[in-house]
A protein has these predicted regions:
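Enriched for short, Lys/Arg-rich terminal
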Residues: 58, 65-93
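Arg/Lys-rich, positively charged N-terminal/basic patches that mediate binding to nucleic acids
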Residues: 1-34
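Generic structural signal for well-ordered secondary structure
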Residues: 4, 27-30, 46-50, 58, ...
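A short, surface-exposed loop/turn module that caps and links secondary-structure elements
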Residues: 41-65
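Conserved phosphate-interacting/catalytic interface
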Residues: 37
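Glycine-rich, flexible loop/turn motifs
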Residues: 2, 19, 42, 50-53, ...
Length: 93
């Protein structure tokens, strides 16, 4: 029921309310999504709102899920039991 680990130090910094230059344009929506991820008790909790566009990933990211932050950025993570692990904000394109 919480974010257990971060895969990216910059993502953890955003979650801890620190400024990260490369995420300056998406700071607010990224923080909102990270907070939602931290509060989720099940993966199903992340299906709302629909704008999250929760997706189970395939290929080289098999086993991961993603939440849409913007057209360009996603929050990718692994879901284990009731926790998110290896959380990172990635430039998806």
């Amino acid at each position: 029921m919480a974010i257990r680990t971060f895969k990216c130090a910059d993502t953890e910094a955003v979650f801890q309310l620190r400024r990260v230059a490369r995420f300056a344009n998406i700071e607010r929506p990224a923080l909102r999504k990270l907070k939602q991820l931290d509060l989720a008790r099940s993966i199903e909790d992340l299906r709302a709102p629909p704008a999250n566009r929760l997706e189970q990933l395939m290929g080289d990211r098999a086993g991961q899920w993603s939440l849409r932050v913007s057209d360009q950025f996603r929050i990718c993570f692994r879901w284990t039991g009731s926790d998110a692990e290896e959380v990172e904000i990635v430039d998806y394109h």
